[in-house]
A protein has these predicted regions:
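Glycine-rich acetyl-CoA-binding "A-motif" of GNAT/NAT acetyltransferases
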Residues: 160
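A short beta-strand signature within small-molecule sensing/ligand-binding domains used
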Residues: 130-132, 140-153
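Cytosolic-side ends of inner-membrane transmembrane helices, especially those
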Residues: 31-37, 183, 187, 191-208
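Juxtamembrane segments flanking the first transmembrane helix
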Residues: 2-99, 105-108
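Extracytoplasmic/periplasmic sensor domains and loops in membrane signaling proteins
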Residues: 74, 105-139
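Short glycine-/small-residue motifs
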Residues: 103, 163
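Helix-start (N-cap) segments at beta->loop->alpha junctions
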Residues: 151-155, 165-184
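Membrane-proximal alpha-helical signal-transduction linkers
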Residues: 205-219
C-alpha cells in the first residue's frame, strides 16, 4: 500500500524550493552590492557636507601667522564658533609647533595652549598631506570620521603653519544606511515568499499537464 507523500517531499515543493533558493541567492548578491554602494555614497555626501569652506581655512592660517598669540587665539575661537554643523563633534586648530590654539568645544577649552600628542597631527605637520580615517570609539560605541588638513601660509604652498583636526559623528549616517537596508531586506523576504508560492502553483500546473494523456488521432 502506497503511503501518502508529504508536501515537503513532493516534486511541487522541491521545484519551488529550488526556485526560492535561486531567487534568494540573486537578491543576496544584489543586496550586498546595493548596501556597499549606498554606504559609499552616504559617506561621500557626509564628508562633503562637513568639509570646512576654504575661507575658514584661510582665516585660520592668517591667525596662526600672527605674532600676537593672545589676540589670534581669540579670533580663532570666534571663527570656530561660526561653524554651525551638528554633525561635527569637535574641531582643533594646531599650530606648526604642535600647540593647540583653539577648539570648537566649549567644554574642552582647557586644552588650548597644550601640546598635542596625536601622531596623525604630528605627521601631517611634517609631510604636508591631509589624512582621513574612520574610527570606532569603544568607550561610547560610536563611529567617527576624522580629518586632519594642513593649513598653508598665503602664497606659499610648502609652508605649513598648522593643521585643522576635525572629528565628526558617523552614527547618523549608519543609522540611515541600516534603515534603508532593513527596508530592502523586508522587501526581499516578501518577494521570496511570494516567489515560493508562485513556484508551487506553476510546478503543479506543469506536472498536471505532463500527466494529461495525449490522444493520438489516426485516420
Amino acid at each position: 500500500m502506497n503511503s501518502k507523500i508529504k508536501f515537503y517531499q513532493s516534486i511541487h515543493f522541491k521545484i519551488a524550493l529550488v526556485f526560492a533558493l535561486m531567487l534568494m541567492l540573486t537578491l543576496e548578491v544584489v543586496g550586498a552590492v546595493f548596501v556597499r554602494q549606498l554606504e559609499h555614497q552616504e559617506l561621500a555626501n557626509f564628508k562633503q557636507q562637513i568639509e570646512l569652506p576654504s575661507y575658514i581655512d584661510n582665516s585660520l592660517a592668517t591667525q596662526l601667522t600672527s605674532t600676537d598669540t593672545k589676540t589670534a587665539n581669540k579670533e580663532i575661537k570666534t571663527i570656530l564658533a561660526r561653524v554651525n554643523n551638528t554633525s561635527i563633534t569637535e574641531i582643533w586648530v594646531v599650530d606648526a609647533k604642535g600647540i593647540i590654539r583653539g577648539t570648537s568645544s566649549s567644554g574642552n577649552q582647557g586644552i588650548v595652549g597644550q601640546k598635542t600628542t596625536d601622531t596623525v597631527i604630528k605627521n601631517t605637520l611634517v609631510n604636508n598631506r591631509s589624512h582621513t580615517e574612520n574610527l570606532y570609539d569603544s568607550a561610547n560605541h560610536n563611529r567617527y570620521y576624522v580629518s586632519v588638513v594642513p593649513l598653508l601660509a598665503s602664497g606659499n604652498a610648502n609652508n605649513v603653519v598648522g593643521v585643522v583636526y576635525m572629528r565628526a559623528n558617523l552614527e547618523g549616517v549608519y543609522s540611515t544606511i541600516n534603515s534603508i537596508s532593513l527596508i530592502y531586506l523586508s522587501a526581499a523576504l516578501i518577494t521570496i515568499v511570494l516567489g515560493l508560492g508562485l513556484a508551487v502553483l506553476i510546478s503543479r500546473e506543469i506536472i498536471r499537464e505532463s500527466k494529461t494523456p495525449v490522444v493520438v488521432l489516426t485516420t
